[in-house]
Amino acid sequence: MRREVVKGIIPIMKQGIFEKEIFIQSDVKTVVDLIADYSQHHKIHPLIEKVERAKDEPAGVRRYFITDNLQWGPFKFKIKYQADIISVTENVVHTQAYQSPNTFVENVTTVTPVQNGVTLHETITLKTPDLLFNYAFQQAQTAHAEMLKRIKSFVESHRGQGV
């Protein structure tokens, strides 16, 4: 883990976990393929403006640079962060993201077959400096709740067409 030290001060970090879940009328492969294809995330993630594939990636990792549009009260701003797809299996997508200063997000998404579809379940772990935590945690919870609704809508509206 990287730590930034400013004038000898190590920031106080705070961590939180939240989970989101939604039923989707689809198959596991279709949903996993969409989640693991970051080039499609500007269509499903409410904050994402731009997704760029990194030129250099560690072995076995798909690395992207993502630009989000954020708002804090009357202030609108953009952030750019690194997002890595660590692993993709038949039904699990594991990702990690990092944005300065010291903001880390880990996402483990599991897609489980159920009658007439699948259940998409996300577990998000956010670690950030204490002063940023409440804002970042609220933004992440709101964005991921909306993203799951958009994944459901996108996948179900494209059934039989390939996503």
Residue map of PLM features:
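Beta-strand/loop substructures that line and gate deep hydrophobic ligand-binding cavities in soluble
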Residues: 96-146
